[in-house]
Amino acid sequence: MIEPKCARCPDRPCSRGLPEGSPLPGFCPIQNYKSLIDEVVKEYRGPAVRDFYLAAALTEKNGYDARAAREEGRTVPIRPRIRELAEFARAIGARRLGLAFCSGLHDEAGRAAAILEKHGLEIVSVICSCGAVDKTEAGVPAEHKIREPGAFEAACNPLVQAEILNRLEPSFNILVGLCVGHDMLFTSRSKAPVTTLIVKDRLTGHNPVASLYSRYYRDIV
């Protein structure tokens, strides 16, 4: 089986449509996974996916200036992601959303919740330190603590965050700054779909693409 390497593709012909016989890179999944693609695309019309998929398409469309897109062929963004989350929730008829956040981003989580509530949504939120569990109770060796090994240091508790929100049955959950790995544990345990508002990057002010663009990060990545 040939592994896809789309991140290395120089032309992205799939984003422009493919006339019959168009040349494709050898690693292109369009030619190596054609039957799989044809089969899975049918699922977007099915009841399990259709509403989410159409709402996502509408949210994407409404995120751009309509006149610039239709008349000038330009994609000019007009909404930030937090607004798109509110509009997407409205499009799927959501009333309650879950918010799982890192204690280090408590202020940002509060601001996000307030904005979403302004749009008429009910927000249920759970902090990562919920439970006040010391890291050693969760199996982390004391020497792996960030500060003093003998002092209390709250363990991140993504499974508890997910399980509490599972019982509250939000339409979807929003992540705000969970650590690498903890975000994966939360996502794997959450029964509701999960999206991310803020991805944690301590060094860049939670803007991980900065380390891809700036030469100042070159020696530390």
Residue ranges and their predicted role:
Residues M1-V221:
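An N-terminal assembly and electron-transfer interface module characteristic of large anaerobic redox
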